[in-house]
Amino acid sequence: MTKYIFITGGVVSSLGKGIAAASLAAILEARGLRVTLIKLDPYINVDPGTMSPFQHGEVFVTNDGAETDLDLGHYERFVKTTMTKRNNFTSGKIYENVIKKERRGDYLGGTVQVIPHITNEIKRCIKLGADAFDVAMVEIGGTVGDIESLPFLEAIRQMRIELGSQRAIFIHLTLVPYIATSGETKTKPTQHSVKELRSIGIQPDVLICRSEKPLSMADRAKIALFTNVEKEAVISLEDANSIYQIPMILHAQHLDEIVVKKLSLEAKQADLSEWQRVVDMQAVQTMTVKIAMVGKYTELNDAYKSINEALLHAGIHTETKVEIIYFDAEMIEKHGALLLESIDAILVPGGFGERGVEGKIKAIQYAREHKVPFLGICLGMQTAVIEFARNVVGLTGANSTEFNKETLYPVLGLISEWMDADGSKQTRDESTDLGGTMRLGGQYCHLAEGTLARKVYGKSQIIERHRHRYEVNNKYVDSLVKHGLIISGRSADNSLVEMIELADHPWFLACQFHPEFTSNPRDSHPLFKEFVFAARIHHQEKDKK
C-alpha cells in the first residue's frame, strides 16, 4: 500500500524543492524502500516540449519518450527509479484529459468543474504514478499563494483526508532569510507561508527551512511554536558546497526517521555510504580543465542542467575540477573561434533553430583543425556533419533543411520513418504538430567495432535517449565516409546515423542522442568521463609546449 509525501514550497520560488525531494527519496531508498517521485506543474502547457529554455530551463526526456520538467533529471540522478510519463503532469495535461472525457460523454451531461472533476483527475494521475511503490513523493510546482497551484493543493488536501495521516504527510519548504546587516535570521516569512497553507486546509507535518546558515535551536523552536509543527520536525537546510551532500545533511537531522514514523513504514537503517563516497571523491581534484560550452541558451544555466551535472559527475570520477566556460554561439559567429584558444575541450549541446548555428560550426572547425577534444550532442552532431561536409568534403553551402530548405547539399533532413526500440515503426511529416514530430525516448544504437565509441562504451549495443526531428541524410554518407568521417553508431535497423567520429583526431565524438540524461553521480556516464579525461590529456600536452 503506497504511502504519500506531498512537498510544497513557500515564500519564493527556486528554493530547491526538487533537490530536497530527491535527497529525501535517496535516503528512503537507502533504507530499502521502493521510492518514486512525481512532479505536478501548474502551467497550462501540456508539457514543456515546446517551451523556450529561457522560460523553463531544459526539457528532460524520459526513457519512454516523455518531455518533462528538469526536476525529473534531479530525481533520476538521486534515486535508481527510472522516471516515466507518469511522473510529470501539468495543468494543461490534466485539463486536456478532463476535456477529452467531457467530449466523450463520460460525465453524462453534468457540469464540469474544477471541483470535483479537475481535482479528481489530479488524484487519479498521482495514484497512477505511485502504483506499485512503497513511497511516492509528490512535488507541487510553484509557490503557495499562486492561483495556478490551487487545484493541486485542493487535490492533495482531499487525499490526506481520504488516505489518513498514516498514509499521507505534508512537507513544506520555505525560506528563512539571513539579514547580514543585523546578523539575524527572519522567521516571519515562514510563519506567513504556513499561515497561507493552513488557510486552504493543509497543516504541514514537517518544515524544511532553506537558509544561508544553519538555523539555531532557538529559531527552530520559534518556527515550531508559530506554525504548529513539532520542533524536531523543523529541519534546517543550509546552503551546501555540493547538492550531493544534502542527503547526509537531512539524515543528520533524522528527517527520514521522522517520515518513517509518521507513515508507519517498516524500513532498515539508512546506508548512505554510497553518497559519502561521492562527496569524498568530489573533494579530490588533481587538475582543473576548462570546457567550452558553445550554445544559444548560455544566459540560463538551467537550459543545460543535465549536461552541467554530467560534466560534474565525470569530474568526480576522474579527480578533475571541471570549469565550464559558456560561449554564446553568436559571439563566435561574429568574432571567430580564436575566443577558444585557452580551452581544453569543446562541447556543442543540442538546440533548435537557425540562430547561432554558424558560430557552432566555427567552434567545431576549430576543434577539428586544432585537435581539441570535442563532444557534440544532438544538434552538436548535426553541425559537426555540416562542418565536415563544407570544409573537408568540399560541399560549399551544405546545410540542414531545418536551416535552409533550398540548400544544394541537404546533408541533414527530416526523416519520415524510423524504428523504435521495441521494433515498431514510427512516422512523422512536416504537417504534424511540433509535439508529435520528435524522435523521443530510449532507442537502441549499434556501435561499430574498432571505433572510439565502442571503446568508450565497452559494448556493441547501447540504449540512449533521443529528442530531435532531423537526421543525417543517407544520400551523403558514402561521400562523408570516403573523406574520413567514421560512422561509429547506427540505429537498430541500421538506417540512421547515431554517432560519428574522426580517425585523424585524438578525441572527436558526436552523437545524435542525449547521453546527459542517463548520467548520475554514483557511476558517471562513460562518454562524459572519457571526454573529461581527454580534456586532461590535452591540458597536460598544452603545458608541455
UniProtKB/Swiss-Prot annotation:
Pathway this chain belongs to: Pyrimidine metabolism; CTP biosynthesis via de novo pathway; CTP from UDP: step 2/2
Chain positions recorded as L-glutamine binding sites: 351, 379-382, 402, 469
Binding positions for ATP per the UniProt entry: 14-19, 71
Annotated GO biological process: 'de novo' CTP biosynthetic process; pyrimidine nucleobase biosynthetic process
Binding-site residues for Mg(2+), renumbered to this chain: 71, 139
Xref: PROSITE patterns: GATASE_TYPE_1
Name of the protein in its database record: CTP synthase
Source organism: Legionella pneumophila (strain Lens)
Taxonomic path: Bacteria, Pseudomonadati, Pseudomonadota, Gammaproteobacteria, Legionellales
Gene: pyrG
